[in-house]
């Protein structure tokens, strides 16, 4: 097909394959004289002219033309010795574009490196390279001009008259369009006094300072430059200058753009810092400070008098004050009302102001009357009240261990009689307060101990008197504001009734405060029935019994049982004709069966004995009486001197440890164990429970004693479940 086309006699098929420039002439001359040479020559000239107009980018090495500059750049890489990238400033040539960029940075070291500046630099490089190539192409085309190639200048003539962008070589129909393009893309910052334009705001500022010498007006021009309103005025000015010669325009622009490059370090000074009035942090911009102030939106009403830091909540300030107390030690923190230098002050007043509820509060010496007249700064904030009876604490000297600076923390902890007496007779206040406090604390501890633990040999009359003393002690506590669980008449931190009046510690509940008060009063209500041990908590006594009296807990103790509590503290009076029943015994965990019921229950009753220890009251504010964990002898007195021996109700097994008995019942006499054994194994008569040192009872005695117990399986496993 390719060889048949040039042989065709028709003239319109000859110029159809004009894709090969060199081969076309050879095929044309080999066709013979049949083809009209004139027509072919005219067609060849017209085709070559059209092809030359399309391929406007010739190679400077081999002369080959290309349609696009990018293809020419790729083609130049094929020439080993050619370096297509040339520096427009010094003529340096580079084989790659990246190398030329690195070289151009040496000419403009202080040019800003923003993304827009990089883009403009790249566009300038491309424009300069295009101009260099076009210049070389024109020079080579002029030297090798022939009649066939003279027509190459015809399609290039209109390009010279078009309006080109000096940066990106874009074509525009009118000069206004080109100026608009330059202003939007390449020169957005324009001077309001001349036709200078730049792509960077720093360059415009430098131009305004150097050319016009008015720093105020360029700042106004820069602030007004970004809005599009003042922009349409300058474009008509450069119109008559850019129309005649658009090509040499990059030369002055090239000179103008690098000149403001060293203006970066000569920028106007930064605006003054914007400082936060709350925390003191400074910012360079106002909107940074505005965003920072969002953190301080909430009210900071509680300020530290030492460092000035503010807090939202009062307890934050209190925790913060501990830091200053640990750092400053005995030094006093400067308060807001501190004035000129005064007489030497007590060194530990500042520490007490920071820690008003700590133990050091009770050890602070009393300050001078001049210091008490000062208005309180932190003391009022920390709920410390002035001395009662005199304004600003101007009364007589208080006790050395109970006040500081005329202020008394937790003043409701003192007896009401002492406070009244202090207000009436201020001259004897110190001795009276000390005596009242000692008497009050001693009487409170002794009265509570006497009411809890009556001495043996005391009759019901003494019990009634003890109950009356306990009631009077409770009334005194209510008067002094020390009743556990009650509220105090005065406000402040002590109004919850959970602060210790001795050391000032705060507790979460009234029970914790009650247990803590036993440390100061020496009260130990939980006494061991087997030895002289006494504990402040029931858990301490339980641990003591488990560790030292485990064998004695299984049976009756060797000594006589302790005296029962007075009848006034019992929930119900004992029945007539019966001796006073002992305190209820709490069964040991894991025991095989509970003790037989009291004599009041019928012989055939299966009702479990009640535990009155959980319901009885001791008359101290409606609180439950502590459990008695000791074991008492049964009604028959079957316990021997050596403790009880636990015998199995189903087999002859016996042991002195209740834990082993419970394990034996679970392994050998549970439902699962009975299911594995033959039925005659369970038909054996049960063995009664016999103390150690005695023989098993007869079957008749078993029937009599077993009538008062529940069924064997229930008795054995019921105690284990408990």
Curated annotation (Swiss-Prot):
Give Gene Ontology CC terms. membrane; nucleoplasm; nucleus
Q: Which family does it belong to?
A: Belongs to the krueppel C2H2-type zinc-finger protein family.
Q: Which residues carry this modification: Phosphoserine?
A: 16, 692, 698
Q: Which domain of life is it from?
A: Eukaryota
| The species this protein was found in | Homo sapiens (Human)
Q: What is its main location?
A: nucleus
Domains as described in the record: C2H2-type zinc-finger domains 5 and 6 are important for the interaction with SOX9.
Please state what the protein is called: Zinc finger protein 219
């Amino acid at each position: 097909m390719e060889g048949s086309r040039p042989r065709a006699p028709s003239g319109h098929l000859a110029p159809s394959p004009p894709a090969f420039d060199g081969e076309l002439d050879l095929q044309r001359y080999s066709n013979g004289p049949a083809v009209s040479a004139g027509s072919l020559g005219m067609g060849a000239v017209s085709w070559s002219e059209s092809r030359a107009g399309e391929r406007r980018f010739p190679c400077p090495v081999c002369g080959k033309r290309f349609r696009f500059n990018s293809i020419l750049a790729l083609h130049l890489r094929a020439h080993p010795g050619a370096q297509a990238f040339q520096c427009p400033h010094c003529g340096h040539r580079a084989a790659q574009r990246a190398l030329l960029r690195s070289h151009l940075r040496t000419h403009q070291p202080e040019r800003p490196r923003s993304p827009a500046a990089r883009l403009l630099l790249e566009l300038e490089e491309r424009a300069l390279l295009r101009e260099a190539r076009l210049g070389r192409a024109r020079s080579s085309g002029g030297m090798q001009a022939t009649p066939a190639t003279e027509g190459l200048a015809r399609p290039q003539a209109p390009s010279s008259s078009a309006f080109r962008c000096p940066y990106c070589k874009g074509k525009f129909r009118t000069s206004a369009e080109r100026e608009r393009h330059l202003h939007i893309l390449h020169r957005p910052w324009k001077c309001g006094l001349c036709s200078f334009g730049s792509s960077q705001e720093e360059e415009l500022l430098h131009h305004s300072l150097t050319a016009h010498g008015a720093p105020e007006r360029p700042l106004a021009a820069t602030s007004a430059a970004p809005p599009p309103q003042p922009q349409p005025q300058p474009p008509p000015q450069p119109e008559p200058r850019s129309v005649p010669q658009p090509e040499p325009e990059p030369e002055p622009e090239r000179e103008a753009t690098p000149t403001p490059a060293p203006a970066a370090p000569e920028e106007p000074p930064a605006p003054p810092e914007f400082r936060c009035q709350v925390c003191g942090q400074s910012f360079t911009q106002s909107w940074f400070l505005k965003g920072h102030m969002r953190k301080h939106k909430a009210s900071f009403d509680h300020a530290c008098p030492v460092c000035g830091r503010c807090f939202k909540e009062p307890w934050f300030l209190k925790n913060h004050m501990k830091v200053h107390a640990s750092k400053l030690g005995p030094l006093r923190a400067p308060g807001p009302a501190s004035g000129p230098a005064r007489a030497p002050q007590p060194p530990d007043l500042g520490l007490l102001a920071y820690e008003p509820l700590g133990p050091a509060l009770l050890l602070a010496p009393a300050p001078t009357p001049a210091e008490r007249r000062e208005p309180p700064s932190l003391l009022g904030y920390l709920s410390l009240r002035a001395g009662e009876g005199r304004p600003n604490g101007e009364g007589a000297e208080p006790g050395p261990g109970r006040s500081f600076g005329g202020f008394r923390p937790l003043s409701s902890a003192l007896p009401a009689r002492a406070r009244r007496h202090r207000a009436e007779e201020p001259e004897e206040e110190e001795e009276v307060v000390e005596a009242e406090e000692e008497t009050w604390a001693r009487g409170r501890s002794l009265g509570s101990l006497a009411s809890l633990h009556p001495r043996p040999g005391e009759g019901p009359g003494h019990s009634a008197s003890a109950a009356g003393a306990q009631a009077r002690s409770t009334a005194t506590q209510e008067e002094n504001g020390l009743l556990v669980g009650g509220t105090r008449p005065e406000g402040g931190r002590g109004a919850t009734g959970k602060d210790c009046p001795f050391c000032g510690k705060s507790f979460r509940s009234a029970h914790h405060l009650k247990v803590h008060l036993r440390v100061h009063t020496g009260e130990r209500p939980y006494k061991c029935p087997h030895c002289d041990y006494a504990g402040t908590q029931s858990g301490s006594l339980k641990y003591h019994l488990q560790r030292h009296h485990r064998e004695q807990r299984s049976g009756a103790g060797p000594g006589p049982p302790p005296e029962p509590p007075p009848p006034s503290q019992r929930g119900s009076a004992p029945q007539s004709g019966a001796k006073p029943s002992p305190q209820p015994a709490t069964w040991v965990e894991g025991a095989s069966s509970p003790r037989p019921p009291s004599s009041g229950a019928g012989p055939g009753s299966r009702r479990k004995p009640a535990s009155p220890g959980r319901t009885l009251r001791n008359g101290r504010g409606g609180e439950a009486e502590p459990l008695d964990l000791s074991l008492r002898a049964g009604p028959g007195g079957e316990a021997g001197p050596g403790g009880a021996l636990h015998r199995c109700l189903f087999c002859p097994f016996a042991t002195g440890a209740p834990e082993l008995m419970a394990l034996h019942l679970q392994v050998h006499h549970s439902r699962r164990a009975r299911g594995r054994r033959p039925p005659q194994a369970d038909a054996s008569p049960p063995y009664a429970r016999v103390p150690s040192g005695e023989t098993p009872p007869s079957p008749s005695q078993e029937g009599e004693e077993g009538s008062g117990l529940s069924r064997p399986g229930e008795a054995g496993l019921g105690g284990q479940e408990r």
